[in-house]
Regions:
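N-terminal Rossmann NAD(P)H-binding glycine-rich loop of SDR-like oxidoreductase domains
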Residues: 4-26
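Non-catalytic, hydrophobic alpha-helical segments
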Residues: 15, 211, 215, 232, ...
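N-terminal Rossmann-fold cofactor-binding loop
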Residues: 33-37
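Conserved Rossmann-fold cofactor-binding substructure of NAD(P)-dependent oxidoreductases
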Residues: 50-75, 83-84
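Active-site "gating" loop of Rossmann-like NAD(P)-dependent oxidoreductase/epimerase domains
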Residues: 98-145, 152-156
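Conserved beta-loop-beta element that borders a ligand/cofactor-binding pocket
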Residues: 146-173
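Alpha-helical substrate-binding/gating segment
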Residues: 183-193, 201-238, 245
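Mid/C-terminal beta-alpha module of Rossmann-like enzyme folds, strongest
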Residues: 218-278, 283, 303-304, 314-376
């Protein structure tokens, strides 16, 4: 009996090799279809390559010809095109997309009077429903369109579909490696680093090996995963300041943090990804249904990421640095820091008129003693 056939669309990026090698270990005959811009030496033999661009229908159809597959894992390209092309060509389609970008913006009234929560259930269906003025939400709108087309085909019986959403990836080979904003400043000998609002912003992220493990779990459980949308994020999320401190410590460096309001703190915008507030997602469903757990702990994941970037440094003003959008303009950063310090000095000492904050509950020293302010 022939081995089951799997097609991985992508396969050479940050999570692809883990998925390809995991499929091989599960007995699949694996083919990858990708644009050919990046190659990878897999640790398993006999992985066939098709070089076509999966962003467009004609090249994708040309690449697969009359072939059919037991499983397609779509990690790259345009999902709305892939979802259509593989109708009747595969039994299962496991698609990877976004975990946070599919949800409506903060101002959408469907979130209710309290607005969009900083953290909300991964079962939420408050999706982006219009591109927005000047196309501000166009990418999220297209992502939702593609995801819903995928599930429409699932309902129609074209194939069994599963969608797995990632927040921003980090790890070896990741595009837009935002941690490089910190690493390069260490390498360049910067002593000061600008942070906004105390560095308390938190983004959900997923380490590449952890993300791939989630995909493989969905592949292992076809009946449970059928028709499901999962989100997967690392179990622990850290503040920006914690991330900066970890990188600096790992490299034997110490920064002086220059804290200022977000409106002024433009040097940190690339690391903050130009959003002041948190970007968080839960991954409750995949943990409950598929028993997903992070295979790689956060300290090991972050250390691996830093070490890989040290060994594979992005070229100055090259593709990766342009994806990050950090100019590393230290002259203007120093000017901003100097102006901020001057402004703080001119403001002088600000005295606080606040009283001692009392605990909410009574801490009586004798029976019947009433609540009173002050420490317990």
């Amino acid at each position: 009996m022939a081995d089951p056939r799997a097609l991985v669309i992508g396969g050479t990026g940050p999570t692809g090799p883990f998925v390809v090698e995991g499929l091989h270990e599960r007995g699949f005959d694996v083919t990858i279809l990708h644009g050919g811009q990046h190659e990878y030496e897999f640790a398993v033999p006999n992985v066939r390559h098709i070089h076509e661009d999966p962003h467009f229908q004609e090249p994708l159809e040309r690449g697969i010809g009359s072939q059919t597959f037991d499983l397609v894992v779509a990690q790259y390209g345009r999902l709305r095109i892939i979802a259509e092309v593989f109708k009747g060509r595969t039994e299962r389609l496991v698609a990877v997309g976004g975990a946070t970008g599919i949800f409506a913006p903060d101002t959408d009234p469907r979130w209710g009077a309290t607005g969009k929560p900083a953290l909300f259930a991964d079962s939420s269906t408050v999706y982006v429903r219009e591109p927005g003025e000047d196309g501000a939400n166009k990418i999220g709108f297209r992502m939702v369109e593609a995801m819903e087309a995928l599930f429409e085909n699932h309902t129609a019986g074209a194939y069994s579909a599963t969608y797995i959403g990632y927040p921003v990836n980090y790890g070896p080979r990741s595009p837009g490696p935002y941690d490089w904003s910190v690493i390069r400043r260490v390498l360049d000998g910067r002593r000061s680093i600008v942070v906004a609002d105390g560095g308390i912003k938190i983004d959900s992220r997923v380490f590449t090996a952890n993300a791939a493990a989630a995909v493989l779990l969905a592949i292992d459980e076809p009946e449970i995963a059928a028709g499901k949308r999962y989100s997967v994020a690392d179990d622990n999320a850290f503040t920006m300041r914690q991330r900066i401190e970890f990188i600096a410590s790992h490299l034997g460096h110490e920064f002086e943090f220059v804290d200022m309001p977000y409106e002024l703190a433009w040097p940190c915008y690339p690391l903050w990804r130009h959003v002041r507030g948190h970007r968080l997602t839960l991954s409750t469903l995949i943990r409950d249904e598929l028993d997903y757990r992070d295979p790689v702990a956060p300290d090991a994941a972050m250390a691996t990421t830093v070490d890989w970037l040290l060994a594979n440094r992005p070229a100055p003003d090259g593709e990766l640095e342009r994806q990050i959008g950090d100019p590393f303009d230290y002259e203007r950063e120093d000017q901003l820091i100097a102006r901020w310090r001057d402004a703080r000095e001119a403001l002088g000492t600000v005295e606080s008129p606040l009283p001692v904050q009392g605990h909410q509950y009574r801490h009586p020293k004798a029976p019947g003693e009433a609540w009173k302010p002050g420490p317990s």
